[in-house]
């Protein structure tokens, strides 16, 4: 979810800068053997290519979906970053760096603003549970009283970095009832409902900011040793929220789910990034920037002004001067800057080989019904056992040099697959250009076999985007199409993509929506931060614009019956990172969906498909004992069709029998 890579220590920042401007990059050759991927559409024919730029008047292209509404963020929030979404009842709650924005989406064609509550922080990601709303705060501008302006003091009890708890019984007037402070803030968080504990909910906190001073929050410590119980690294913080008194929410454990992980290499810059870095370096050199060699890689790096300015000030003071540094002062710094950089790199703490160089999760998706979670943890993808909420256990960990930043995770409905997204470039860079590798900044799909993750394939947005559009895999959710694994996903300015990953080795796009760049002349942030299916609609948080609502339309990939069956699934609330198990109520559209899928597979004779459909239609027109008899007869006749797809035929049979009614 970040619009930039997470903040790190000063040495890490310099190292990151070194990578960003490196001219020669060594890329570890340990990428997976990449399976065949579907070719990208021809740019000459894909309607998403070449769209007109504009903030509120950009060109648009859609395929197999229809946009039903587009609403602009309200004054005071427009121009500030829109972030993640959560849903409760008829409301969509949209995070924004200025505070939560609440929309009434009961009419998907006309979202209505309910309230926009000022409470600045980043990222202000949102979750809900009953009458409670939770909101992440990580940056130093957050205050415990929700007032703007931040906190000037380096140590202050007014600073808020953690998870806020609101009472939204009156959703028009959210009431702040608790600030749960954490050592690294809360970049994102996940609400976990334990089926065995009805008195509490739990929150897994993913913090990626620098560690706070223990003078500001007791117990915070920066020790890198994984076995140090006081360390704030290599931990996720677990908050317990007592439902009888949510104001007493508190951190109850800091769990280490990283122990024993190895450092893993990732790919370096793409060819386009190398070219851009070379140009940037040339411009910086011509402008008189301070440049040194990275002592680890030998690459040139531009020293950031925030490091140079204090050094120049020191030289000026040392000679008894004041004001702006002169040419001699600059020359003095140029003479020693390489030695300073060498010492900086040498003095930086180096974790041992047994400790991951990524010491945090970006996002954790929990699946309470199955007692498992998927941790997207920057350098690794994790499979966790969460049957005991305060003691998560790592079952497996995977790494991939094609992945730069393990960002988010989604299970399929039966929990046999797990998809991870890679936010290569941190979300603020163009990573869907023609020359960008299809396995970089993509999704990686794994099957879960004996509690282990087995890689199957990658999926990446197939449409090429421009160099002025931030684009990479981001947040999404399952669409409840029965019998299939179908997901809608945001790709920032790449728009939204709906794809089928039922066949884990061959995922395929089946619907999309995209806009042109926010600005055709420069990189300007925008696009879909997250898009989730909620009660019949796909609702997207548009970073720069507001809120979009869309719906699927029938196509060769999705039938009207499948869409109708999906719309029978209704939730009272939804946190996409707290993945609910999808269950379909009995309906004729459900049965018809399975018949459509058998036809699409092509292994049942068309005349037989027609017979099945005719029998379903006839049964639908009857009632009582007559309907029950018709459904029983058709169900028994389907046994002869199991040779095509036994699992699908059994689902159809069950759907038919579930439609039987009790006859008095």
Regions found by a protein language model. Give the residues of each.
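A short, amphipathic alpha-helical segment
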Residues: 1, 548, 552, 657-664
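Soluble extracellular-acting proteins and domains
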Residues: 561-664
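Residue-level signal for mature regions of secreted extracellular proteins and peptides
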Residues: 23-24, 58, 637
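N-terminal secretory signal peptides that target proteins for export/translocation
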Residues: 1-15
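Feature marking well-ordered beta-strand scaffolds used for ligand recognition
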Residues: 30-598
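Bacterial N-terminal signal peptides
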Residues: 17-28
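Generic alpha-helix initiation/capping and coil-helix boundary signal
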Residues: 12-15, 19, 366, 584, ...
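Intrinsically disordered, low-complexity segments enriched in Ser/Pro/Gly/Ala and basic residues
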Residues: 8-11, 25, 496
């Amino acid at each position: 979810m970040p619009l930039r890579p997470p903040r790190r220590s000063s040495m890490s920042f310099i190292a990151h800068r070194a990578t960003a401007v490196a001219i020669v990059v060594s890329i570890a050759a340990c990428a997976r053997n990449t399976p065949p991927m579907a070719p990208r559409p021809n740019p000459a024919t894909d309607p998403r290519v070449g769209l007109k730029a504009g903030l509120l008047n950009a060109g648009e292209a859609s395929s197999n979906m229809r946009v039903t509404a587009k609403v602009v963020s309200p004054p005071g929030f427009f121009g500030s970053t829109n972030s993640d979404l959560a849903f409760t009842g008829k409301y969509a709650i949209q995070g924004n760096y200025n505070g939560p924005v609440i929309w009434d989406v009961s009419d998907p064609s006309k979202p209505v603003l309910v309230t926009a509550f000022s409470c600045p922080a980043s990222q202000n990601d949102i979750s809900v549970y009953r009458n409670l709303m939770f909101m992440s705060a990580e940056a130093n501008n957050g205050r415990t009283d929700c007032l703007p302006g931040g906190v000037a003091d380096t140590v202050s009890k007014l600073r808020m970095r953690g998870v806020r708890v609101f009472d939204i019984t009156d959703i028009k007037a959210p009431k702040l009832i608790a600030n749960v402070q954490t050592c690294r803030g809360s970049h994102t968080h996940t609400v976990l409902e334990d089926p065995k504990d009805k008195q509490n909910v739990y929150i897994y906190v993913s913090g990626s900011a620098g560690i706070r001073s223990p003078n500001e929050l007791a117990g915070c410590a920066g020790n890198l040793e994984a076995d140090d119980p006081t360390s704030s690294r290599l931990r996720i913080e677990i908050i317990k929220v007592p439902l009888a008194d949510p104001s007493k929410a508190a951190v109850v454990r800091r769990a280490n789910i990283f122990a024993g992980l190895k450092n893993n290499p990732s790919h370096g810059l793409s060819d386009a990034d190398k070219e851009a870095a070379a140009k940037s370096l040339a411009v910086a050199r011509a402008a008189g920037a301070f440049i040194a060699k990275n002592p680890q890689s030998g690459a040139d790096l531009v020293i950031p002004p925030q490091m140079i300015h204090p050094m120049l000030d020191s030289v000026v003071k040392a000679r008894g001067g004041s004001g702006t540094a002169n040419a001699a002062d600059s020359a003095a710094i140029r003479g020693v800057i390489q030695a300073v950089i060498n010492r900086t790199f040498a003095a930086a703490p180096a974790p041992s080989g047994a400790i991951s160089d990524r010491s945090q999760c970006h996002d954790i998706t929990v699946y309470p019904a199955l007692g498992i979670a998927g941790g997207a943890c920057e350098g690794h993808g994790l499979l966790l056992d969460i049957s005991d909420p305060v003691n998560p256990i790592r079952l497996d960990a995977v790494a991939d040099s094609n992945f730069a930043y393990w960002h988010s995770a989604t299970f399929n409905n039966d929990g046999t697959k797990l998809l991870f997204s890679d936010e290569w470039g941190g979300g603020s860079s163009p990573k869907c250009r023609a020359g960008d590798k299809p396995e970089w900044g993509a999704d990686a799909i794994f099957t879960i076999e004996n509690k282990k993750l087995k890689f199957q394939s990658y999926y990446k947005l197939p449409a090429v985007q421009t160099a002025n559009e931030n684009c990479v895999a981001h947040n999404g959710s399952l669409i409840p199409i029965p019998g299939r694994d179908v997901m809608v996903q945001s790709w920032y300015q790449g728009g939204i993509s709906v794809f089928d990953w039922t066949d884990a080795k061959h995922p395929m796009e089946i619907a999309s929506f995209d806009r042109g760049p926010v600005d055709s002349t420069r990189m300007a942030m925008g696009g879909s931060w997250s898009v989730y299916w909620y009660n019949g609609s796909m609702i997207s948080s548009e970073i720069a614009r507001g809120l979009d609502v869309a719906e699927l339309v029938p196509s060769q990939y999705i039938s009207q019956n499948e869409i109708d069956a999906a719309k029978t699934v209704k939730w009272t609330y939804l946190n996409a990172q707290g993945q609910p198990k999808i269950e379909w109520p009995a309906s004729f559209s459900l049965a018809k969906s399975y018949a459509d899928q058998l036809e699409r597979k092509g292994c049942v004779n068309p005349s037989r498909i027609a017979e099945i459909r005719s029998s379903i239609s006839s049964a639908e027109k009857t009632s009582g004992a007559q309907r029950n008899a018709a459904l029983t007869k058709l169900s028994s006749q389907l046994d002869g069709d199991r040779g095509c797809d036994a699992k699908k035929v059994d689902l159809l049979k069950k759907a038919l029998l579930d439609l039987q009614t009790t006859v008095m």
